[in-house]
Every structure is written in structure tokens, then in C-alpha cells.
């Protein structure tokens, strides 16, 4: 085992003589953080939390548009950069395409028809043939029979008149799916003796 005298020179002679030199500290000129003078010009630190929405821009070169995904957001007072040269090859080869002027849509305007204000809408609503609710004189026979049969159903007080409202044909005399009027004034009874599309269940499963 080595004696104490062999390693005495390592620590005893260097106490209080440690190296304290740092050439240039990262934050300033001096490495002595307690006794050094403050620098004359403070560092220009950008305050990211400060709002400049209602104030004039301090730095013209500083752009405050934020790029997120495919959208670009602009703050008040900032203009979109339309003067930039296009980057795509089509615009470089053929030039900028001419875009027609399209006025902005007024989203606050009502789209409900005002008959008194517009003569065209008044003419569309009341045509000369006396038709109403979008029905015109040039409809197919199938659709006209459907509309006439449903109107007959409304006129007759809910009692179905003879005829199929879909095809316009009359009912067969042996059909069992029909409405029987109630004798005592209660609700009508609908007889439905139909076979389901897959047939009746056998009850085995």
C-alpha cells in the first residue's frame, strides 16, 4: 500500500490555486457572474406573447403570416403576397392564367323568395296555366296519376279510391289488402295478409 507521502503533492500544494480562467463565456464577456459589469446594450429579445393586431408594424421586413398546412393566415394590416413569382411550371411556361372577376357572396343576404321585390320570381311562382307547387302541364302520365291519386286520397278524407297510386291501375276484386271503413267511427282497420319476402319461418331454428 502506498504511503500518504507518495501522493501528498497531488492535492496539498494545489489548494486555493485552481484554474479559474474561461476565455469567453457563452452569455457575455466575463466569466465572473457576480462582479462583472452589465453589458451596455441589452440583447434584443423578441416578445412572442406581445400582440400587434391593432398597432402598426414596427419592422416592415418582419412577416406575421403563419403557414399551417395548406392554409395561410394573415393578420390585420398584413397584405397577402400576390406579387410573388409563381413556382409551378405551368405558370412559368404559359404565364399566369386569366381569372374572371367573381364578386364575393353576401352570406348575410336572405335566400327566401321575396315576391314583391322581384318580378321574375313572381312570374315563376304563378304561371299562366294555374299550376301550383312546382307542378307543370308537361309531366308524364305515371307521375300525374300518382299525384292525382294522392290528391284523391286527401280529398276523400283518407279513404282510398279505386286504383293503384303507383301504376294508376285499378284494384283487383279479390285483393285482401284494402282499407275497411269503421262502422262505429273509430280508427280504420287495415287488413294485411301478405307473405314476407323470404317466406314464413318454419319455426325450426
UniProtKB/Swiss-Prot annotation:
What superkingdom heads the lineage? Eukaryota
**What cellular component terms from Gene Ontology apply here?**
cytosol; microtubule; microtubule associated complex; nucleus; spindle
Q: Which GO terms describe its molecular function?
A: microtubule binding; structural constituent of cytoskeleton
- Its chief place of residence is nucleus
InterPro entries the UniProt entry points to: JUPITER
Positions carrying Phosphothreonine are: 41, 98, 102
Q: Which residues carry this modification: Phosphoserine?
A: 30, 138, 149
* PANTHER family from the UniProt entry: GEO05313P1, MICROTUBULE-ASSOCIATED PROTEIN JUPITER
Summarizing the function annotation, the protein's role is: Binds to all microtubule populations.
Q: What is this protein called?
A: Microtubule-associated protein Jupiter
What is the organism field in this record? Drosophila virilis
Amino acid at each position: 500500500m502506498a504511503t500518504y507521502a507518495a501522493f501528498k503533492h497531488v492535492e496539498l500544494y494545489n489548494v486555493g490555486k485552481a484554474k479559474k480562467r474561461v476565455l469567453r463565456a457563452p452569455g457575455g464577456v466575463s466569466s465572473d457572474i457576480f462582479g462583472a459589469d452589465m453589458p451596455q446594450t441589452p440583447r434584443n429579445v423578441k416578445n412572442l406573447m406581445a400582440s400587434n393586431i391593432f398597432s402598426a408594424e414596427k419592422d416592415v421586413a418582419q412577416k406575421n403570416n403563419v403557414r399551417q398546412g395548406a392554409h395561410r393566415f394573415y393578420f390585420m394590416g398584413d397584405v397577402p403576397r400576390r406579387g410573388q413569382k409563381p413556382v409551378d411550371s405551368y405558370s412559368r411556361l404559359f404565364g399566369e392564367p386569366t381569372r374572371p372577376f367573381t364578386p364575393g357572396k353576401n352570406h348575410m343576404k336572405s335566400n327566401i323568395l321575396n315576391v314583391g321585390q322581384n318580378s321574375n320570381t313572381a312570374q315563376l311562382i304563378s304561371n299562366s296555366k294555374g299550376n301550383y307547387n312546382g307542378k307543370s302541364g308537361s309531366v308524364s302520365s305515371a307521375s300525374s296519376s300518382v299525384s292525382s291519386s294522392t290528391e284523391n286520397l286527401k280529398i276523400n278524407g283518407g279513404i282510398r279510391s279505386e286504383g293503384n297510386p303507383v301504376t294508376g291501375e285499378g284494384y283487383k276484386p279479390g285483393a285482401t289488402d284494402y282499407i275497411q271503413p269503421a262502422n262505429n267511427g273509430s280508427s280504420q282497420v287495415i287488413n294485411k295478409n301478405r307473405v314476407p319476402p323470404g317466406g314464413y319461418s318454419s319455426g325450426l331454428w
